Design a protein with these regions (language model features):
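Hydrophobic faces of well-ordered beta-strands that scaffold small-molecule active sites
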Residues: 1, 27-33, 50-52, 97-103, ...
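N-terminal active-site wall of soluble small-molecule enzyme domains
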Residues: 1-46
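Surface-exposed amphipathic alpha-helices with a cationic face
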Residues: 10-23, 89-93, 158, 162-166
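Catalytic alpha/beta core domains of metabolic enzymes, predominantly
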Residues: 71-81, 113-220
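Active-site-proximal loop/turn and secondary-structure-junction residues that shape catalytic pockets
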Residues: 2-5, 33-39, 54-58, 103-109, ...
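Glycine-rich, proline-tolerant flexible connector loops at the mouths of alpha/beta enzymes
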Residues: 1-17, 54-76, 142-151
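Short amphipathic alpha-helices and their capping/turn segments at secondary-structure boundaries
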Residues: 39-44, 81-98
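Glycine-rich tight-turn/loop motif centered on a GG-T
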Residues: 20-23, 47-84, 111-122
Length: 220
């Protein structure tokens, strides 16, 4: 979902799906929103679930301009994040919309990169910042994903996220996947290695095998 025009299209699709079923839409709609928090707000009024990326939810894109943040600057940015995110949570509560907080290894914010670098710890903290706000606001309809194209990084990061949530008395469902897995046998093996290792640990609630092929090829 790139902009308001796409949100309008989603509303029309949702209306058609709902009109053909007396018990609500035939299938839930999910909006995957990057770069524009106002689009996430609008989509949350229309669809059943909205995915946001912590790395670009507040700022439109990584700027690579500010490398060092003072503690005061860091806290100011966290407060800005909290204030903006609460607006979305309030909309989701009103419309009974679920959220997916989806962290990507390749799109961590400048602020996270400045303190944690390009690390599993940084990915986990990027997710936890949003979860802490959600917990304070008593919003529980959340699923998490934390993905990387490197399977070792992905597995390490998800395990670390599970540990960190336990440390802070949190428990949210996890969606597993290896991003940019590729195609053919390599893409399938790569996904199987990353997802399978976590499932063997008893970690994970939903999965997606992401392939750079026709969409129907992702179906089991």
């Amino acid at each position: 979902t790139q902009g308001m025009r796409e949100v309008e299209s989603l509303a029309q699709i949702h209306q058609r799906l709902t009109a053909s079923s007396p018990h609500g839409p035939i299938a839930p709609l999910v909006a995957d929103v990057h770069f524009q928090s106002d689009v996430a707000d609008a989509a949350a009024k229309v669809v059943e679930k909205v995915r946001i990326n912590p790395g670009n939810y507040i700022d439109p894109a990584r700027k690579f301009k500010q490398i060092d943040y003072t503690d005061e600057e860091y806290q100011t940015e966290l407060e800005r994040l909290r204030n903006r995110f609460v607006q979305l949570l309030d909309i989701c509560k009103e419309h009974k919309t679920a959220l997916r907080i989806g962290v990507n290894h390749g799109s961590l914010s400048d602020r996270i990169m400045s303190r944690y670098g390009d690390t599993p710890e940084g990915m986990v903290e990027s997710c936890m910042e949003f979860l802490r706000v959600a917990v304070v606001e008593d919003f529980k309809d959340i699923v998490l994903s934390i993905k990387a194209s490197n399977t070792r990084v992905m597995v390490t990061t998800v395990r670390l996220l599970v540990w960190q949530m336990a440390e802070e008395n949190m428990a949210f469902p996890l969606h597993l996947g290896v991003t940019e897995a590729g195609e053919g046998e390599d893409g399938r093996v790569k996904s199987a290695v990353g997802i399978g290792a976590l499932l063997a640990d008893g970690i994970g609630d939903t999965i997606r095998v992401s392939l750079s092929e026709a969409p129907e090829k992702e179906l089991p």
